[in-house]
Amino acid sequence: MIDYLSYTYSPREYGYTWLKGFCMGAVLLYLFYDNVLIGIIGGVFAGILYAVSHKKYLISMRKWELNMEFKEGIAGISTALRAGYSIENAFTEAEKDLRILYNGQSYIEKEFAYIEKQLALNRTVEELLHELAIRSGIEDIESFAGVFITAKRTGGDMVAIIQSTVKNINEKLEVKREIQTMVTAKKLEGKIMNLIPPLMIAYLRISSPGFLDPLYHNLTGMLIMSAMLGIYVLAYQIGKQILDMEV
Protein backbone atom coordinates (compact mmCIF):
# COMPACT_ATOMS: atom_id res chain seq x y z
CA MET A 1 0.00 0.00 0.00
CA ILE A 2 0.94 3.66 -0.33
CA ASP A 3 3.49 5.20 2.02
CA TYR A 4 2.08 8.72 2.34
CA LEU A 5 5.26 10.01 3.97
CA SER A 6 7.29 9.56 0.78
CA TYR A 7 6.87 10.09 -2.95
CA THR A 8 8.61 8.51 -5.94
CA TYR A 9 8.71 10.35 -9.25
CA SER A 10 8.18 8.50 -12.49
CA PRO A 11 11.07 9.17 -14.95
CA ARG A 12 8.82 11.37 -17.09
CA GLU A 13 7.45 13.25 -14.09
CA TYR A 14 10.93 13.86 -12.68
CA GLY A 15 12.19 15.04 -16.07
CA TYR A 16 9.35 17.55 -16.41
CA THR A 17 9.79 18.80 -12.83
CA TRP A 18 13.57 19.11 -13.22
CA LEU A 19 13.20 20.96 -16.53
CA LYS A 20 10.78 23.41 -14.94
CA GLY A 21 13.25 24.12 -12.12
CA PHE A 22 16.13 24.35 -14.60
CA CYS A 23 14.34 26.96 -16.72
CA MET A 24 13.41 29.10 -13.72
CA GLY A 25 16.92 28.90 -12.25
CA ALA A 26 18.70 29.52 -15.56
CA VAL A 27 16.59 32.57 -16.41
CA LEU A 28 16.95 34.03 -12.91
CA LEU A 29 20.74 33.60 -12.86
CA TYR A 30 21.11 34.98 -16.37
CA LEU A 31 19.17 38.10 -15.37
CA PHE A 32 21.38 38.60 -12.31
CA TYR A 33 24.76 37.82 -13.93
CA ASP A 34 24.29 38.26 -17.69
CA ASN A 35 26.25 35.04 -18.21
CA VAL A 36 24.85 32.08 -20.13
CA LEU A 37 27.31 29.58 -18.61
CA ILE A 38 26.41 30.59 -15.05
CA GLY A 39 22.75 30.35 -15.98
CA ILE A 40 23.12 26.82 -17.38
CA ILE A 41 25.28 25.47 -14.54
CA GLY A 42 23.10 27.08 -11.89
CA GLY A 43 19.99 25.90 -13.69
CA VAL A 44 21.12 22.28 -13.40
CA PHE A 45 21.35 22.56 -9.62
CA ALA A 46 18.16 24.62 -9.47
CA GLY A 47 16.34 21.81 -11.28
CA ILE A 48 17.51 19.26 -8.70
CA LEU A 49 16.58 21.50 -5.75
CA TYR A 50 13.19 22.27 -7.28
CA ALA A 51 12.46 18.55 -7.75
CA VAL A 52 13.24 17.93 -4.06
CA SER A 53 11.09 20.88 -2.95
CA HIS A 54 8.22 19.91 -5.25
CA LYS A 55 8.28 16.36 -3.87
CA LYS A 56 7.58 17.76 -0.39
CA TYR A 57 4.68 19.74 -1.85
CA LEU A 58 3.25 16.62 -3.53
CA ILE A 59 3.50 14.66 -0.27
CA SER A 60 1.72 17.46 1.57
CA MET A 61 -1.08 17.67 -1.02
CA ARG A 62 -1.57 13.91 -1.07
CA LYS A 63 -1.87 13.83 2.73
CA TRP A 64 -4.36 16.70 2.60
CA GLU A 65 -6.49 14.84 0.05
CA LEU A 66 -6.40 11.67 2.15
CA ASN A 67 -7.33 13.64 5.25
CA MET A 68 -10.39 15.19 3.58
CA GLU A 69 -11.41 11.83 2.08
CA PHE A 70 -10.97 10.14 5.46
CA LYS A 71 -13.67 12.43 6.83
CA GLU A 72 -16.14 10.95 4.34
CA GLY A 73 -14.91 7.44 5.12
CA ILE A 74 -15.46 7.60 8.87
CA ALA A 75 -18.81 9.31 8.32
CA GLY A 76 -19.80 6.24 6.29
CA ILE A 77 -18.59 3.95 9.08
CA SER A 78 -20.61 5.92 11.62
CA THR A 79 -23.75 5.67 9.47
CA ALA A 80 -23.30 1.92 9.01
CA LEU A 81 -22.81 1.38 12.75
CA ARG A 82 -26.00 3.30 13.52
CA ALA A 83 -27.79 1.05 11.03
CA GLY A 84 -26.75 -1.98 13.09
CA TYR A 85 -23.77 -3.31 11.13
CA SER A 86 -20.79 -4.81 12.92
CA ILE A 87 -17.58 -2.80 12.78
CA GLU A 88 -16.10 -5.13 10.15
CA ASN A 89 -19.18 -4.89 7.93
CA ALA A 90 -19.32 -1.13 8.52
CA PHE A 91 -16.03 -0.79 6.62
CA THR A 92 -17.50 -2.81 3.75
CA GLU A 93 -20.58 -0.57 3.60
CA ALA A 94 -18.47 2.58 3.85
CA GLU A 95 -16.26 1.33 1.00
CA LYS A 96 -19.35 0.88 -1.20
CA ASP A 97 -20.42 4.47 -0.48
CA LEU A 98 -16.93 5.75 -1.23
CA ARG A 99 -16.87 3.87 -4.53
CA ILE A 100 -20.03 5.72 -5.58
CA LEU A 101 -18.80 9.07 -4.24
CA TYR A 102 -15.31 9.03 -5.76
CA ASN A 103 -15.76 6.57 -8.64
CA GLY A 104 -12.53 4.74 -7.82
CA GLN A 105 -10.41 7.91 -7.87
CA SER A 106 -9.67 8.34 -4.17
CA TYR A 107 -6.98 7.18 -1.77
CA ILE A 108 -9.42 6.38 1.03
CA GLU A 109 -11.50 4.07 -1.14
CA LYS A 110 -8.39 2.04 -1.93
CA GLU A 111 -7.46 1.99 1.75
CA PHE A 112 -10.91 0.76 2.80
CA ALA A 113 -10.89 -1.86 0.02
CA TYR A 114 -7.50 -3.03 1.32
CA ILE A 115 -8.87 -3.19 4.89
CA GLU A 116 -11.84 -5.21 3.62
CA LYS A 117 -9.53 -7.73 1.92
CA GLN A 118 -7.27 -8.00 4.97
CA LEU A 119 -10.26 -8.59 7.25
CA ALA A 120 -11.10 -11.59 5.09
CA LEU A 121 -7.62 -12.90 5.95
CA ASN A 122 -8.46 -12.70 9.68
CA ARG A 123 -6.49 -9.55 10.44
CA THR A 124 -8.06 -7.22 13.00
CA VAL A 125 -9.52 -3.78 12.35
CA GLU A 126 -7.35 -2.36 15.14
CA GLU A 127 -4.18 -3.64 13.50
CA LEU A 128 -5.15 -2.30 10.07
CA LEU A 129 -6.15 1.14 11.36
CA HIS A 130 -2.90 1.39 13.31
CA GLU A 131 -1.01 0.48 10.14
CA LEU A 132 -2.85 3.17 8.15
CA ALA A 133 -2.13 5.75 10.85
CA ILE A 134 1.60 4.99 10.68
CA ARG A 135 1.72 5.05 6.86
CA SER A 136 -0.24 8.28 6.58
CA GLY A 137 1.34 10.30 9.37
CA ILE A 138 -1.95 12.23 9.58
CA GLU A 139 -2.97 13.39 13.04
CA ASP A 140 -6.72 12.84 12.52
CA ILE A 141 -6.21 9.24 11.38
CA GLU A 142 -3.83 8.59 14.26
CA SER A 143 -6.42 10.06 16.66
CA PHE A 144 -9.25 7.97 15.23
CA ALA A 145 -7.15 4.79 15.32
CA GLY A 146 -6.17 5.45 18.94
CA VAL A 147 -9.76 6.09 20.04
CA PHE A 148 -11.01 3.06 18.12
CA ILE A 149 -8.39 0.72 19.60
CA THR A 150 -9.06 1.99 23.14
CA ALA A 151 -12.84 1.63 22.73
CA LYS A 152 -12.48 -1.90 21.35
CA ARG A 153 -10.24 -2.99 24.21
CA THR A 154 -12.33 -1.43 26.99
CA GLY A 155 -15.65 -2.54 25.54
CA GLY A 156 -17.12 0.97 25.46
CA ASP A 157 -20.11 2.15 23.44
CA MET A 158 -18.43 1.91 20.03
CA VAL A 159 -21.19 3.76 18.14
CA ALA A 160 -21.29 6.72 20.55
CA ILE A 161 -17.50 6.96 20.75
CA ILE A 162 -17.03 6.88 16.98
CA GLN A 163 -19.83 9.40 16.43
CA SER A 164 -18.20 11.78 18.90
CA THR A 165 -14.80 11.30 17.25
CA VAL A 166 -16.28 11.84 13.78
CA LYS A 167 -17.91 15.08 14.95
CA ASN A 168 -14.65 16.37 16.44
CA ILE A 169 -12.64 15.49 13.33
CA ASN A 170 -15.23 17.13 11.06
CA GLU A 171 -15.15 20.36 13.07
CA LYS A 172 -11.37 20.36 13.04
CA LEU A 173 -11.20 19.77 9.28
CA GLU A 174 -13.69 22.56 8.58
CA VAL A 175 -11.46 24.98 10.47
CA LYS A 176 -8.45 23.68 8.55
CA ARG A 177 -10.30 24.11 5.26
CA GLU A 178 -11.17 27.74 6.07
CA ILE A 179 -7.58 28.49 7.02
CA GLN A 180 -6.36 26.73 3.87
CA THR A 181 -8.63 28.93 1.75
CA MET A 182 -7.20 32.10 3.31
CA VAL A 183 -3.62 30.85 2.99
CA THR A 184 -4.17 29.98 -0.69
CA ALA A 185 -5.00 33.63 -1.43
CA LYS A 186 -1.85 34.75 0.41
CA LYS A 187 0.24 32.19 -1.50
CA LEU A 188 -1.00 33.67 -4.78
CA GLU A 189 -0.02 37.14 -3.57
CA GLY A 190 3.38 35.78 -2.58
CA LYS A 191 3.96 34.23 -6.02
CA ILE A 192 3.14 37.55 -7.69
CA MET A 193 5.52 39.42 -5.37
CA ASN A 194 8.27 36.87 -6.05
CA LEU A 195 8.06 37.73 -9.75
CA ILE A 196 8.55 41.47 -9.24
CA PRO A 197 12.39 41.60 -8.75
CA PRO A 198 13.32 39.49 -11.83
CA LEU A 199 10.65 41.24 -13.92
CA MET A 200 12.07 44.63 -12.91
CA ILE A 201 15.56 43.55 -13.98
CA ALA A 202 14.20 42.20 -17.26
CA TYR A 203 12.27 45.43 -17.85
CA LEU A 204 15.36 47.59 -17.23
CA ARG A 205 17.47 45.44 -19.54
CA ILE A 206 14.90 45.70 -22.33
CA SER A 207 13.80 49.32 -21.91
CA SER A 208 17.21 50.78 -21.01
CA PRO A 209 20.00 48.72 -22.60
CA GLY A 210 23.29 49.39 -20.88
CA PHE A 211 21.73 50.79 -17.70
CA LEU A 212 22.76 47.74 -15.66
CA ASP A 213 26.11 47.20 -17.41
CA PRO A 214 28.13 48.47 -14.39
CA LEU A 215 26.75 45.51 -12.42
CA TYR A 216 27.85 42.90 -14.97
CA HIS A 217 31.22 41.37 -15.91
CA ASN A 218 33.20 42.88 -13.04
CA LEU A 219 33.95 41.72 -9.50
CA THR A 220 32.21 44.58 -7.69
CA GLY A 221 29.07 44.23 -9.77
CA MET A 222 28.99 40.45 -9.29
CA LEU A 223 29.32 40.85 -5.52
CA ILE A 224 26.45 43.36 -5.44
CA MET A 225 24.22 41.17 -7.60
CA SER A 226 25.14 38.10 -5.54
CA ALA A 227 24.12 39.95 -2.37
CA MET A 228 20.83 41.01 -3.98
CA LEU A 229 20.21 37.45 -5.17
CA GLY A 230 20.94 36.12 -1.68
CA ILE A 231 18.46 38.55 -0.12
CA TYR A 232 15.87 37.62 -2.74
CA VAL A 233 16.27 33.87 -2.13
CA LEU A 234 16.24 34.36 1.66
CA ALA A 235 13.04 36.42 1.49
CA TYR A 236 11.48 33.76 -0.74
CA GLN A 237 12.37 30.96 1.68
CA ILE A 238 11.10 32.86 4.74
CA GLY A 239 7.79 33.61 3.01
CA LYS A 240 7.48 30.00 1.88
CA GLN A 241 8.10 28.61 5.37
CA ILE A 242 5.54 30.97 6.90
CA LEU A 243 2.83 30.01 4.40
CA ASP A 244 3.69 26.29 4.55
CA MET A 245 3.34 26.03 8.33
CA GLU A 246 1.20 23.14 9.51
CA VAL A 247 -2.24 24.23 10.68
Model-identified regions with their sequence ranges:
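Membrane-associated alpha-helical segments
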Residues: 137-194
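Hydrophobic alpha-helical signal-anchor/transmembrane segments
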Residues: 1-75, 173-181, 185-247
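Glycine-centered flexibility sites
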Residues: 84, 122, 155-156, 221, ...
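Hydrophobic residues in alpha-helical segments
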Residues: 32, 81, 119-120, 152, ...
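Juxtamembrane/interface alpha-helical elements of multi-pass membrane proteins
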Residues: 42-134, 139-151, 157-159, 163
